Amino acid sequence: MGFMELVYEGKAKAVYKTREGLLMVFKDEVTAGDGARRDKAPGKGALAAETSTLLFQYLQGRGVTTHYLMFVPPNAILVKPAQVPPLEVIVRFKAYGSYLKRMPKAKPLTPFAKPIVEFHYKDDSLHDPLILEDDVVEAGLLTAGELAAVKDMALRAASALRELYASVDCDFVDVKFEFGRVGGELVLVDEVSGDTFRLLCGGEHFDKEYYRKTGDAVGLVERYAKLLELTKLALSRQKV
């Protein structure tokens, strides 16, 4: 890569400016509770980077524009620089996670009649609060037109991922996306991995929820390895 300048370091990734674009390096660490719990997880970075690579490529093939450029083994991806508002977009197919806290009458894993799209202001110190669509526009995070475009992209991406993993008999529960502007165009950014979605296979988590529930970082890495295998198998079935 040659020249590299650290631009940002978060809980799961470090981002470097290079001549070719931004290099997103995935860490061998896992956190929960907005960083309150943190453990070393050797091998996690490489697994998350490769999984994100495969899923970005898959989504691009399904018409979802992303910031992804190329995989940089073993644990990084090269991406286009983007202007990213502090906004998380969650698509839920079933009741789980924080949804159950605000809607206590819902039973875990109850399917929704149609996917629910949520917007959260991204701020760990505030625990990423849920905000209204009107809030998104009034705060200047997105224009009304951009908001509609983001909802459409999020639903299309989430539905494509759900379809992918259904081919290996896994239940895609929900997913968290981030979007940014590249040359005036809204694109999917950040990562798409077990850190950003919930996937149940045979009733077991192959995502970060396993760590949230158990605190077992070693076991999480083993499940991320299995997630990568499942992803490759699912993709091979898409090509048939």
Curated annotation (Swiss-Prot):
<dbReference type="Pfam" id="PF01259">
    <property type="entry name" value="SAICAR_synt"/>
</dbReference>
<dbReference type="GO" id="GO:0006189">
    <property type="term" value="P:'de novo' IMP biosynthetic process"/>
</dbReference>
<dbReference type="InterPro" id="IPR028923">
    <property type="entry name" value="SAICAR_synt/ADE2_N"/>
</dbReference>
<comment type="pathway">
    <text>Purine metabolism; IMP biosynthesis via de novo pathway; 5-amino-1-(5-phospho-D-ribosyl)imidazole-4-carboxamide from 5-amino-1-(5-phospho-D-ribosyl)imidazole-4-carboxylate: step 1/2.</text>
</comment>
<protein>
    <recommendedName>
        <fullName>Phosphoribosylaminoimidazole-succinocarboxamide synthase</fullName>
        <ecNumber>6.3.2.6</ecNumber>
    </recommendedName>
</protein>
<dbReference type="InterPro" id="IPR050089">
    <property type="entry name" value="SAICAR_synthetase"/>
</dbReference>
<dbReference type="InterPro" id="IPR033934">
    <property type="entry name" value="SAICAR_synt_PurC"/>
</dbReference>
<keyword id="KW-0547">Nucleotide-binding</keyword>
<keyword id="KW-0436">Ligase</keyword>
<dbReference type="GO" id="GO:0004639">
    <property type="term" value="F:phosphoribosylaminoimidazolesuccinocarboxamide synthase activity"/>
</dbReference>
<dbReference type="GO" id="GO:0009236">
    <property type="term" value="P:cobalamin biosynthetic process"/>
</dbReference>
<dbReference type="GO" id="GO:0005524">
    <property type="term" value="F:ATP binding"/>
</dbReference>
<comment type="similarity">
    <text>Belongs to the SAICAR synthetase family.</text>
</comment>
<keyword id="KW-0658">Purine biosynthesis</keyword>
<keyword id="KW-0067">ATP-binding</keyword>
